[in-house]
A protein has these predicted regions:
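Right-handed parallel beta-helix
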Residues: 101, 179-208, 212, 217-221, 225-228, 259-270, 285-296, 308-321, ...
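Short, solvent-exposed linear motifs at loop/edge-of-secondary-structure regions
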Residues: 164-177, 217, 221-223, 257-269, ...
């Protein structure tokens, strides 16, 4: 971006407006059928992240991890453990140890720095910071489990369990069912090697329970709202349309959960800590990370493990230690309704990795320089990686690409809305695609995006359905292949259902150089949209206050005057923050979200009628 544009955006950031100029949004019903979507407005913490003002303890540089842990343990509910400005050299990790309703807050990521030279055991995994519940609860040994005998329809909030002993109102319930043993020819949940997964092991090791030798990767995390006998009211309602008695549906839950814990306003340096995870949320609910600068994590910077309605926002992630496989930014390993919003990812190999998550929103993030040890290979900004992912929304992001791989199995009902995916990074020439949906990635919705790079991409779609099977690395779309770069692999054939169930509408691409409003790209069973009007958002009811005066929406075929050659793209706030924030001598941002974004009430949401412990498995 040119200097004048940078200066303009700098001035915009300094004088952000508090008003909203959003126009009323048309219903998403006009484009995406109700069977293919959910109400994403409920992702994250209902209302907003708590703004706590009472301090229970103030610690200064020189404090040890043990002293920080003691302060957290002694902190009354709803208060803050404050780490004043300076550097804390910690030879062990920080452990919330089952404590709920506490905020760990620094003076700002440019003022308070935690340097880890050790870590903490977090129910069998290692982390720099562990936010966990009080009792071990994982797929190999749930505290409580039962059968689920009735109430399977999409959207229902009433289910019947075999037993409710040990269950109480407010419990976090995990619903699951057996994977499909054969291809259904439609919605397909599978992690079996050669049938749907290319992992070289006999099982792909996607997360989830295994009962009687059958994996259970489809899950949804719900809260218990009421109990009457064995009839249970849940919130939210069921997301997927394929819950059914033939798959032996069941439920499991912990005795406790970590609730409303937050980590704010600090830098975390994981470089020499030896932890697998940076911040690990385990059996957590309504927790958050906000305004954190996270440096050089190992497996991941933030690990959302058996976690629901947790928020990661206004945060800067830099680097991974190995730049290989298992080098992630935010990893949503198992969970529902999490919100990953307005973050910056720089030199992170795989910035957002989706395990078997449902109802999660990944919104308005900026991704740059996906550093990988194979210099010419482009890893993608967002990757759906494990079997059982379904009904997740990816909106307003600016990065290089979106991928649903088949390393660990199948995926269903991803919605990709108003993103810019360039399909390219400097120096990359392999896997340079904007959208990759591999075999058994079905029922995706791709709407209102700007895709590809002018002068580089030459093929619209590489698939058997299109009849074009050349130049795979210069294609906007790569659809249905079981192997990389338009090949078959792992003993698995091409999957024609990826293309035939795909919904595309209003996407601008740099091959045809126009937006595609093509009724032939609307699949059977979904009505062709009546017009070309797109909603501004699928989860926000209007422009959020932290957006300021910048154009809203920022991306789409209906956007004009933007910064890219098509005029259809403006920088989102995370990209603007990246562009204008000074860097140190290593190219790392001198980051503080409070200097970039207006602090304000939460974004308005759409309303809808939808409703020696054994180690946990690795992938």
């Amino acid at each position: 971006m040119r200097r004048k544009t940078l200066l303009l955006f700098s001035l915009i950031l300094l004088c952000l407006s508090t008003d909203s100029d959003a126009q009323p949004n048309p219903s998403p019903r006009e484009i995406i059928g109700v069977d293919r979507r959910i109400d994403w407005s409920q992702a994250g913490i209902p209302g907003s992240i708590p703004n706590r003002t009472a301090f229970c303890a103030t610690l200064n540089p020189g404090a040890t991890a043990a002293q920080i842990n003691s302060a957290i343990a002694a902190c009354p509910s709803g208060q803050v453990v404050f780490l004043s400005a300076g550097t804390y050299n910690l030879s062990a990790g920080i452990d919330f140890a089952g404590k709920s309703n506490v905020t760990l807050r620094g003076a700002g990521p440019d003022l308070t720095t935690l340097v880890f030279t050790g870590n903490v055991n977090c129910w069998g995994q290692s982390a720099s910071i562990c936010v966990r519940n009080a009792d071990l609860h994982w797929i190999g040994g749930p505290a409580h489990s039962t059968t689920w005998t009735a109430g399977y329809a999409k959207g229902t909030t009433q289910i019947t369990l075999g037993s409710t002993a040990g269950l109480s109102v407010g419990s976090l319930l995990i619903l699951d069912q057996d994977n499909d043993t054969t291809d259904t020819g439609g919605v397909y949940v599978c992690d079996t090697n050669t049938a749907c997964a290319t992992d070289t092991s006999s099982s792909s090791s996607s997360p989830g329970r295994n009962l009687n030798g059958v994996d259970r990767n489809q899950q949804q995390f719900v809260q218990v709202a009421a109990i009457k006998g064995t009839r249970v009211t849940i919130s939210p309602g069921l997301y997927m349309p394929n819950w059914r008695s033939s798959q032996n549906p069941g439920a499991w839950w912990a005795r406790t959960k970590a609730t409303l814990d937050g980590i704010e306003n600090m830098t975390l340096d994981h470089t020499t800590g030896g932890a697998k995870g940076g911040i690990l949320f385990l059996n957590a609910y309504k927790c958050w990370v906000k305004n954190v600068k996270s440096l050089k994590a190992n497996r991941n910077h933030v690990w959302l493990y058996q976690t629901a309605r947790t928020v990661v926002r206004d945060t800067y992630f830099y680097g991974t230690q190995n730049a290989l496989a298992l080098s992630y930014g935010v990893e949503s390993f198992m969970g529902s309704d999490n919100l990953i919003e307005n973050n910056i990812f720089q030199r992170v190999t795989a910035p957002v990795l989706m395990g078997n998550s449902s109802g999660t929103v990944v919104g308005y993030n900026f991704f740059t320089d996906h550093y990988y040890n194979v210099a010419s290979w482009m890893t993608t900004s967002i990757d759906a990686h494990d079997a059982g992912t379904g009904m997740n929304l990816f909106e307003g992001n600016e990065g290089n690409g979106f991928l649903e791989d088949n390393i660990h199995g199948s995926h269903n009902f991803a919605t990709v809305f108003r993103n810019q995916f360039t399909g390219l990074e400097p120096g990359k020439r392999l896997q340079t695609n904007a959208i990759i949906l591999m075999a058994h990635s079905r029922y995706a919705n791709i709407v209102g995006n700007v895709l590809g790079t002018s002068g580089y991409h030459t093929v619209y779609e590489h698939s058997q359905a299109s009849g074009h099977t050349g130049s795979p690395d210069k294609s906007i779309y790569l659809l249905g292949w079981s192997g990389v770069q338009g090949k078959t692999a792992g003993g698995m054939p091409y999957d024609p259902l990826v293309a035939s169930t795909l919904l595309r509408w209003g996407n601008f691409d740099y091959v045809t150089k126009q937006a595609q409003w093509n009724s032939a790209e609307i699949p059977a069973g979904n009505a062709v949209p009546a017009d070309r009007t797109l909603p501004s958002s699928l989860y926000l009811s209007s422009k959020p206050k932290w957006w300021g005066t910048m154009p809203w929406p920022a991306i789409g075929p209906d956007v004009t005057g933007g910064q890219d050659p098509s005029g259809h793209v403006y920088a989102n706030p995370a990209q603007v923050c990246y562009n204008v924030t000074p860097k140190d001598s290593h190219g790392i941002l001198i980051f503080n979200a409070d200097r970039c974004y207006q602090q304000s009430p939460p974004a308005p949401r759409r309303t809808s009628g939808f409703n020696d412990l054994p180690l946990m498995p690795d992938t």
